[in-house]
Amino acid sequence: MSEARRDSTSSLQRKKPPWLKLDIPAAVPPAAEEPSFLQPLRRQAFLRSVSMPAETARVPSPHHEPRRLVLQRQTSITQTIRRGTADWFGVSKDSDSTQKWQRKSIRHCSQRYGKLKPQVIRELDLPSQDNVSLTSTETPPPLYVGPCQLGMQKIIDPLARGRAFRMADDTADGLSAPHTPVTPGAASLCSFSSSRSGFNRLPRRRKRESVAKMSFRAAAALVKGRSIRDGTLRRGQRRSFTPASFLEEDMVDFPDELDTSFFAREGVLHEEMSTYPDEVFESPSEAALKDWEKAPDQADLTGGALDRSELERSHLMLPLERGWRKQKEGGPLAPQPKVRLRQEVVSAAGPRRGQRIAVPVRKLFAREKRPYGLGMVGRLTNRTYRKRIDSYVKRQIEDMDDHRPFFTYWLTFVHSLVTILAVCIYGIAPVGFSQHETVDSVLRKRGVYENVKYVQQENFWIGPSSEALIHLGAKFSPCMRQDPQVHSFILAAREREKHSACCVRNDRSGCVQTSKEECSSTLAVWVKWPVHPSAPDLAGNKRQFGSVCHQDPRVCDEPSSEDPHEWPEDITKWPICTKSSAGNHTNHPHMDCVITGRPCCIGTKGRCEITSREYCDFMRGYFHEEATLCSQVHCMDDVCGLLPFLNPEVPDQFYRLWLSLFLHAGILHCLVSVCFQMTVLRDLEKLAGWHRIAIIYLLSGITGNLASAIFLPYRAEVGPAGSQFGILACLFVELFQSWQILARPWRAFFKLLAVVLFLFAFGLLPWIDNFAHISGFVSGLFLSFAFLPYISFGKFDLYRKRCQIIIFQVVFLGLLAGLVVLFYFYPVRCEWCEFLTCIPFTDKFCEKYELDAQLH
């Protein structure tokens, strides 16, 4: 038996490469304690090296004593809420979540704001067995066996190539130089401790072909006149040997695939020697040998030099003498000659200084992924991945980010849809920067044609007019509160209407409600009560106000004027008569005439005018066929649209503060917002998540619109201007939080400042509100400091973060409350505020928003 072992050992030594010299230590009797450096490696399968092709050694795992079950108390609801709140704000004591966020934040800062400080990279470049060189261009020196502690000897792994066991130094650039990997004792860790090792990504067993694919291949072979068996053999034999892991049903972790051919016990050597010829080598068929003889020009890949880019792309370590490296596609199978492997990795540009980076730094900038298909629903249904996943599918999963920009995509879809519907329904206003005038001859209320002019502001965004945008939900103060000036304007118009009467033309051509000055004394009769004999009685006395064309309390049935519900003396408080008892012959001149004018709401300030339908349509007004007086209609309700007011006299559409965030002035305006969202907003949402970004986006936009409604109350504004500046404030906060680790923070600061100043100057154009920009930016700063968890530098910084969250939340709530008080209780009228948001380069460049400027 011992002779057989010696034969197997000598046979195995003959198979060893001639350039590999190893000194195997003598067997040491088992000690009471394990060596300190082998304590982490509890499994014997970890004690294998990769000096020979891997095999699955049947080594029994050491016996583990059964652990006692540790009973733990279930966390209370208060502790769960407290821990969840701390995690959400980024001040949790959980080191894993904190390190995860720090890795994402530093990676985002390095990509957006530039290079990090050298000392930051030096601090991150810790001496670890996981460190790796990205270039992999260093060739180790010849094998050397030196002394080691604990009676063991060190083994130099020739295949490590500077991948592992890098030590930190104090160079100027913060990068460390690789050292020769030293494997303690018989455990060669260089091949599986590095993240660049090929055993991190073991090749998977090829899937079985479908019936359709095999049928198609068979038909193609018959058409070409080839044998189906030959094609199958050529496709199947592309490796010098099949890895033993392919024969197993379940894929195990990479340390179990390491070989112990040179360093394991004698029993293991005998077992591996007996199974080595059967499981490793495959004898090529005669057809394959004939194909190889026919193509002698094909280069053998065994022992060839690998290009550096190819090595880094495939993440495969260099093969052994009898390796299983895949040949080029289409290459025939050839016997593998026993030649010495080349230890160089070819690089076109050669090794360059400063191109190596350690694994902790690589993990720092590695994108944290959310497992595809294993989200919240996957956790509830106990969903898991299968044991073997195709490499292409796995690569797609690894390319996905941790946070998906759901809010960005939803917002972009809503913006695009609303803009398309608005343009299709309301059309496109005249394009330009000035005012557009339209002149036409229109039939007026007096029964004659007159030349009238309609003026409207041009829209250079290629979109609807301002009246249409207000009707859709734009920010407009008179629709959100009872504006004092608009309300006084409406009350003055009602007072004039109170003293009006029906003007009946003498030729019986028509009548219209008007004042005495507008009624011709020679061509018409002004039927004014109580002077005119047709005046009705009220409580035994003649009515003092009236008459009203086509409305009289004596002939109206619904609503009827009966005691105790008699119509009041003031005609501006009369209701609309929906049913009349008499026809066209009442012997009352104001009732038997043909009415030529009814109320029409024109403009955006609640102006009502008794006029003809033709004139109302020409002025893009809202004509009321059912009413006879302007006091019977509520023009602000018509102008604002959306949901009717609870009290027709008091506008209450406060929801315009956030509804206008989803509207745009035109197609170009929407394209600008989409570009911003798909670049800046999506990137930040991938970093912070949709919930934080949605809170900052909406609250910043609401605050910006509220400030704009205070200082520019009569200007219709749409678009997420305040929200976008709030998102820009997030970038500033991120820069301030990462100031200590950036190499050139001032450069990044001035770049962001230049972008903000450019957008602020862009807000001097019409239809863009700088007050929303400023308020949205300030509120975005407060919200970003409160809701975005960023890097903490020590325990003191963690406590500072907690105080910062409370302070900035209180400051933001104070800012919002102050703006609400100013808007509803202490209205502000600012004369010069318009120049801050629109500079009048010409007389008609900026639209006049004063109430006395009747543009419509």
Curated annotation (Swiss-Prot):
Pfam families (UniProt xref): iRhom1-2_N, Rhomboid
Cross-referenced InterPro entries: Inactive_Rhomboid, iRhom1_2_N, Peptidase_S54_rhomboid_dom, Rhomboid-like_sf
This protein's record includes keyword Endoplasmic reticulum: yes
Localization per Swiss-Prot or TrEMBL: Endoplasmic reticulum membrane; Golgi apparatus membrane
Function: Regulates ADAM17 protease, a sheddase of the epidermal growth factor (EGF) receptor ligands and TNF, thereby plays a role in sleep, cell survival, proliferation, migration and inflammation. Does not exhibit any protease activity on its own.
Transmembrane segments: 413-433, 657-677, 693-713, 716-736, 748-768, 774-794, 805-825
Cysteine-cysteine disulfides: none
Family that this chain belongs to: Belongs to the peptidase S54 family.
Membrane topology qualifier: Multi-pass membrane protein
Upper taxonomic lineage: Eukaryota, Metazoa, Chordata, Craniata, Vertebrata
Topological region Lumenal: 434-656, 714-715, 769-773, 826-856
Tissue: Expressed in the duodenum, as well as in fetal liver and head.
Protein name: Inactive rhomboid protein 1
